[in-house]
């Protein structure tokens, strides 16, 4: 056991952790030259296209150290994006140490900080690494100071390397073996294994990634899932080298995969503990804190025949992604679908794209909303995650919206722009600290504003230099109203949105103008209105298409013309009574972009 090292890499997006992991795999000979591909561990097509890591992956490598010993390195890759921070905490729970990779040109960013604190809270050994020293803009001295100043760990002897060229990577491995402690645990005790991640394989059923804390697990053992109490047979187990390799036994301290032919998706929840049926452990390992979704949106299949396969797809995806929440929902405009909860907008996009790609579905998304806390007039507290569930205005005592605490790190010269943006988003400043040329800002901003487009706007006002980390702080009373959209005097539930009263007027106007461009012209006038309760705040009309009925009259008598025009008018009136309007998918997406271009 003393030759096992379990570690993961923490870094901000684009600081080079996937490239560094490629190099480590290469040095340890995990893959032959032919099989080496850039970003070996980003196995999802989506991950490769966007160049981000979404899912945690694991690899077991043998490293021949300079002291003549052979060490087994278990390396768990983690994502860097703010929406996937819960993935990071799961990966870290299985490790004893972490490499903190910082770009020597860019310096410390908010996300690095957040993940680094998570690692420190779990008492992991954090080893700082300065990457990209081959770049002309690299300034390792300054960045080392920043690490000490902002993160507060000793970085005087931080390793300098360039994952791209391979310089300094062997030093990283030596330092790993030296500084990161070996796993602790009792090899002869009862088995306790932590489920770090699970995913669904069409042939094998549920595959779980596990870390053995105590005891050992052999092929053919009967294992028990501690939360459900159900027993399964350990059919196959092994390690990733990144390829799946079968083994007969997983020893104490190792990280590997396990297949128990579990067909039920909820059979092995992430964060659960496995133990042996014949010699069970007394208590389960501390799991992970449940993540609360911050953003909710309705997802509906375009054709209602897809509903069943959509439900199965969501089930399989939620196994792989513990933070995805969903419940059935029906809408008069869109039929049957699901209300889904996500961690942020990127998470929502990724899930929608994965559903469309991996499961071949066509989906419509409604506008994302956050969860509001409503105190009704008879003093009940209700949580509302969709505008259609909001009680009538006269039943609401007070409406509270979620406030997010946003930590931003940015260069001084962009401070003015960022503060202006935060004020526009109804934020209040709680803290501001200068670290050299960087400024650490803390603002409390309503979650609805953060979720909408705050991240994009922050990046654009600061030319991409500012970085953001946010978490839910509390609910706060606020003057929020529901803006309904009426098309030909009928409410369309899927288009409603909840917004602050001050913004309601112009968001309503913006929305009806956008809808006017997107709804195709019909044979009759279509009135699009935005309303708060019964009070109409904005209206626009999609003009009808009409045939020139007078074309065949030539000279003709005026009464003849009047008769023809009146006949056309009556016909249009009749059409309007029975006609209904087809809304294109773009119309639903219009809400997502309300207020984005106009500012």
Swiss-Prot record:
Binding site for GTP: 14-19, 131-134
EC assignment: 3.6.5.n1
Location(s), subcellular: Cell inner membrane
One GO biological process term: positive regulation of translation
Residues of the tr-type G domain: 2-184
NCBIfam families: lepA, small_GTP
Molecular function terms from GO: GTP binding; GTPase activity; guanosine tetraphosphate binding; ribosome binding; translation elongation factor activity
Name the UniProt record assigns to this protein: Elongation factor 4
Catalytic activity: GTP + H2O = GDP + phosphate + H(+)
Keywords: Cell inner membrane, Cell membrane, GTP-binding, Hydrolase, Membrane, Nucleotide-binding, Protein biosynthesis
GO cellular-component term (any): plasma membrane
CDD domains documented for this protein: EF4_II, EF4_III, LepA, lepA_C
Chief location category: membrane
Classification via InterPro entries: EF-4 (IPR006297), EFG_III/V (IPR035647), EFG_V-like (IPR000640), EFTu-like_2 (IPR004161), G_TR_CS (IPR031157), LepA_C_sf (IPR038363), LepA_CTD (IPR013842), LepA_IV (IPR035654)
Pfam families hit by this protein: EFG_C, GTP_EFTU, GTP_EFTU_D2, LepA_C
Membrane topology recorded in Swiss-Prot or TrEMBL: Peripheral membrane protein
Family: Belongs to the TRAFAC class translation factor GTPase superfamily. Classic translation factor GTPase family. LepA subfamily.
Chain's role: Required for accurate and efficient protein synthesis under certain stress conditions. May act as a fidelity factor of the translation reaction, by catalyzing a one-codon backward translocation of tRNAs on improperly translocated ribosomes. Back-translocation proceeds from a post-translocation (POST) complex to a pre-translocation (PRE) complex, thus giving elongation factor G a second chance to translocate the tRNAs correctly. Binds to ribosomes in a GTP-dependent manner.
């Amino acid at each position: 056991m003393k030759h096992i090292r379990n570690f993961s890499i923490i870094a901000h997006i684009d600081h080079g952790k996937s490239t560094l992991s490629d190099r480590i795999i290469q040095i340890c000979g995990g893959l032959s030259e032919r099989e080496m591909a850039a970003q070996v561990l980003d196995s999802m097509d989506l991950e490769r296209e966007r160049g981000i890591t979404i899912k945690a992956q694991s690899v077991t490598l043998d490293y021949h150290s300079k002291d003549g010993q052979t060490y087994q390195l278990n390396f768990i890759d983690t994502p860097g994006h703010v929406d996937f921070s819960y993935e990071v905490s799961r990966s870290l729970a299985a490790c004893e140490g972490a490499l903190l990779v910082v770009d020597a040109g860019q310096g410390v960013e908010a996300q690095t900080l957040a993940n680094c604190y998570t690692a420190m809270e779990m008492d992991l050994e954090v080893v700082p690494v300065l990457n990209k020293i081959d770049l002309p803009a690299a300034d390792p001295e300054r960045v080392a100071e920043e690490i000490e100043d902002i993160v507060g760990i000793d970085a005087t002897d931080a390793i300098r390397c360039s994952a791209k060229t391979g310089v300094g990577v062997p030093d990283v491995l030596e330092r790993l073996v030296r500084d990161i402690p070996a796993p602790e645990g009792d090899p002869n005790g009862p088995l306790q294994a932590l489920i770090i991640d699970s995913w669904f394989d069409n042939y094998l059923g549920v595959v779980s990634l596990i870390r053995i804390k105590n005891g050992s697990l052999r092929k053919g053992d009967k294992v028990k899932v501690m939360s459900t109490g159900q027993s399964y047979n350990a059919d196959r187990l092994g390690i990733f080298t990144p390829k799946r390799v079968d083994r007969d036994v997983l020893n104490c301290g190792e990280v590997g995969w396990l297949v128990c032919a579990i067909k039920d998706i909820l059979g092995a929840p992430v964060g659960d503990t496995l133990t042996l049926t014949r010699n069970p452990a007394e208590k389960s390992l501390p799991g992970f804190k449940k993540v609360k979704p911050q953003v909710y949106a309705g997802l509906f299949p375009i054709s209602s025949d897809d509903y069943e396969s959509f439900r199965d797809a969501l089930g399989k995806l939620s196994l792989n992604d513990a933070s995805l929440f969903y419940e059935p929902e029906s809408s008069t405009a869109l039929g049957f679908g699901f209300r889904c909860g996500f961690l942020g907008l990127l998470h929502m996009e990724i899930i929608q794209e994965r559903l469309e790609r991996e499961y071949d579905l066509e989906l419509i998304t409604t506008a994302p909303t956050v969860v509001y806390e409503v105190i009704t007039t008879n003093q009940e507290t209700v949580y509302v995650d969709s505008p259609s569930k909001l009680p009538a205005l006269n039943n609401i005592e007070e409406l509270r919206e979620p406030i997010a605490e946003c930590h931003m790190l940015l260069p001084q010269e962009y401070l003015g722009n960022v503060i202006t943006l935060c004020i526009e988003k109804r934020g209040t400043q709680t803290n501001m600290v200068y670290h050299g040329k960087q400024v650490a800002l803390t603002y409390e901003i309503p979650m609805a504003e953060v979720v909408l487009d705050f991240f994009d706007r922050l990046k654009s006002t600061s030319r991409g230099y500012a970085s953001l980390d946010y978490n839910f702080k509390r609910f706060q009373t606020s003057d929020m109203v529901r803006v309904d959209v009426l098309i030909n005097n009928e409410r369309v539930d899927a288009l409603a949105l909840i917004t602050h009263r001050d913004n309601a007027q112009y968001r309503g106007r913006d929305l009806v103008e956008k809808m006017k461009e997107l709804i195709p012209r019909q044979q009759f006038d279509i009135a699009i209105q935005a309303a708060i309760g019964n009070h109409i705040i904005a209206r626009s009309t999609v003009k009808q298409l009409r045939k020139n009925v007078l074309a065949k009259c030539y000279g003709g008598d005026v009464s003849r013309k009047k008769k023809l025009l009146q006949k056309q008018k009556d016909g249009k009136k009749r059409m309007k009574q029975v006609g209904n309007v087809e809304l294109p998918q773009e119309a639903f997406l219009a809400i997502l972009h309300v207020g984005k271009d106009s500012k």
